Design a protein with these regions (language model features):
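Phosphate/nucleotide-binding beta-alpha loop and adjacent structural elements of enzyme active sites
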Residues: 1-213
Length: 213
């Protein structure tokens, strides 16, 4: 759905973003999406966040030759400091600062390792320190932390044109707002739904546009 009616988010990104976009990606995982951004937008600047050792090292090895990528070993969160990551095997990509609930039964094959302390940074603080004054798109895949990160960084979010976010259709992690509540929260801060991609019963992705920019 959505006014752009595109079936491929990557095609949409190429057509809609400027040649030199500022991109924030949280949940970099192995860096494959980051590398795509860096290749497609050599004049842009991509800031990526991945807090866990194994995926961070994989992403670093994939991305260290891109001059337009800044990779930070942090999780985004409401407050800067230490956080507890509920860690699973890296291949599952399901680790979260949120305690897993429904995902334990919905995805029983995921191997959960335990709790790991990670560094957490508030996005507004990061952008202030790094002189980031506007963002063309945020690309958020954070296993339930997306809403909290957005709501806790109102300054840079208000200066962000698009947010592409993972969303929950059922509770997979503790305390995560489900799709309709999430969309309501986004509408309150000036973002409307452009496009929904909801192929699974548990989670999907939604593209939001800041109607004030």
């Amino acid at each position: 759905m959505g006014k752009y009616d595109k079936n491929n988010i990557h095609d949409w990104v190429v057509k809609k973003l400027p040649k030199n976009p500022v991109i924030i990606e949280a949940g970099v995982y192995d860096g494959s999406d980051t590398a795509w951004f860096a290749t497609k937008f050599p004049e842009g600047q991509i800031y990526g966040f991945e807090p866990l050792d194994e995926p961070f090292n994989m992403a670093y090895n994939r991305l260290n030759h891109f001059p337009n990528v800044t990779l930070s070993k942090y999780a985004l969160g409401p407050k800067t400091g230490n956080g507890i990551m509920h860690e699973c095997d890296w291949k599952s990509g399901s680790s979260s600062l949120r305690k897993p609930t429904g995902t334990l039964t919905f995805h029983p094959s995921i191997k959960w390792i335990g709790e790991t302390q990670v560094n957490v940074i508030n996005l507004d603080e990061f952008c202030f320190v790094n002189n980031i004054n506007q963002v063309d798109i945020m690309w958020l895949d954070m296993q339930g932390s997306e809403n909290e990160v957005i709501q806790s960084s109102p300054n840079i979010v208000s200066k962000t044109k698009f947010i592409y976010s993972e969303v929950s259709l059922i509770e997979m992690y503790e305390g995560v707002p489900l799709l309709e509540e999430y969309k309501t929260n986004m509408k309150k801060i000036g973002f409307e739904v452009v496009w929904e991609d909801l192929p699974w019963k548990d989670m999907g992705d939604v593209l939001f546009e800041n109607i004030n920019l």
